[in-house]
Amino acid sequence: MTLREALTRATRQLAASPDLRADAARDAALLLRHALGISHAAQLADPERTLTPAQQAAFDALVQRRLTNDPIQYITGEQEFYGLALRVTPAVLIPRPETEQLVEAVLNEMKQAELDSKQSLRILDVGTGSGAIAIALAHHLPHAHVTAVDLSAAALEVAASNAARHALTDRIRFVASDLLDALPPDELHFDVIASNPPYVPTADRASLHPQVREHEPAAALFAGPDGFDVYRRLIPQARAALRPNGLLALEIGQGQREAIASLLSGWNELRLLDDLQQIPRIALARKP
């Protein structure tokens, strides 16, 4: 079977699933390249290349995994985030474009502050998962030192490997902690606290795409009946841990604008930023 034939067959298999139809061609091509260890250019250059039996078997196995709604990122073990390649496993939430907007918002706030200050920025990433936020901020803010916390030891292992991959281990420290609970009081003076916490109401579980509902870590998604269990703990902790005028940056869910604004009443400069679908997605506020 040639590359072209294998790709056509896999695309048809994936397209037969209503949950996978929209991205069937893209996913088939990604899986083919991953199975063969070839680039996109190599795939296009020789579509009539014949697959060996071992290559065909490897490709078929990946397609079968995808047909169970296993996310493409878990199959390939990779996801790009803010221009950086990250390792991902089922232990971590797959980084999403909405969280790139959170990073962009923090960078916009901090770059001027960094220029105006001779001191390094101290940043805390709460619920770091793959390390995406911590790594992107450290990469783009060369004078920043980041503490990244997570309750999951498996997630922290993934995050640490990603920091090493991007040569950032000297400026990112990973700590096992339930929110800020494990951080000593003398460390609680951050310039920025950023977080993409769990915020999906448990009642919304059935409405999630099967690949999210069935494969991504529930602890990184769900936050009680209304989705605010983590926010209610995190926001007071963040206020105590920020320096005066320090920045809190949170990703929020659809329909959570008013409740988040209420939880952040008493903070300064509250702003809610919309995503590309005009849904409020990022909350920014300054400690009084």
Residue ranges and their predicted role:
Residues 1-43, 51:
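Non-catalytic accessory regions of SAM-dependent methyltransferases
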Residues 14, 110, 163, 238, ...:
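Conserved hydrophobic residues forming the short capping helix/wall of the S-adenosyl-L-methionine
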Residues 30-109:
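Conserved AdoMet
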Residues 31, 69, 99, 133, ...:
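Residue-level signal for inorganic ion chemistry
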Residues 76, 176-177, 252, 274:
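Short loop/edge segments at beta-strand edges and connector loops
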Residues 98-207:
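Conserved SAM/SAH cofactor-binding pocket of Class I
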Residues 225-285:
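Conserved Class I SAM-dependent methyltransferase catalytic core
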